[in-house]
Amino acid sequence: MRIEDFTQYLLWEKKYSPHTVEAYGTDLSEFEGFLVSMQAPAEDASIDFQAVRAWVVHLMEQGYTPSSVNRKISALRSYFKYLLRRGAIRISPMMRQGNLKEPYRTTVPY
């Protein structure tokens, strides 16, 4: 995976906050580690929807909240959009992966 190139792109070209860039980099490194642990191909063009879906399921089983998982999905979605624009991949594995539903929060007035 081209995580370093992507984070530099976010920082210098897209002008993302350093905290966001660090979080996205961490999320992508975690995903790459998951692929390695599952003995799945970690090359950008070889990553498919099933690998992404397996990671999302793994995160939920680890107790992550839907909002935390959605942030990680957002990092992957941005990464694969970056690769598409650079011509490194032809199809994004994120095309079928939507965000998780989050519980509706209501505020009670005082």
Walk through the language-model features, giving the residues of each.
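N-terminal core-binding DNA-recognition domain of tyrosine recombinases/integrases
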Residues: 4-19, 25-106
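Juxtacatalytic substrate-recognition/specificity segment
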Residues: 109
